[in-house]
Amino acid sequence: MVNRTILITFTNLKLVMDKLIAAFPNNMIEALSIASSAHISKNGREIRNVVITGMGGSGIGGKIVALWLQDELSIPVVLINDYTLPEFVNHDSLVIGSSYSGNTEETLMSLQKAHSKGARIIGICSGGDLEVFCRTNSYDYILVPGGNPPRTQLAYSIVQLVNIFVQLGL
């Protein structure tokens, strides 16, 4: 027989998730506001490929945007959901690190590799080590609000990724 405490816990979790999902339209409005004030420098470098690295909820936005824009973009977009980085990444690559917490080990490792290869890097996070990495290395980054499960913050990820593509004229 299922324990009553477990049922109450699941019911409470459902209520919390329902509330977070219902907040999606407001998150979209806030994400658009953040995007309108974010500045991504063009820096004159030609971008020949894009790599988006992110795990779990932070990586889902990259999948959606890559599929959505695949017929619109003239350059390839590759998604990474682990520690790796494609061998082709170089000075002409844009590597976008998406980590809601800013502390996702796999994303940070991929960005370290991209940094060592001279790639252009942009971060999307709510703070953490990713913000520090970007600030320390003078990389552009966009801060989004923290405090919720990454899978419920999809609006921020999608809007900021599209914002980056638009600002860079991709």
Which residue ranges define each predicted feature?
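Glycine-rich phosphate-binding loops that contact phosphosugars or nucleotide phosphates
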Residues: 44-170
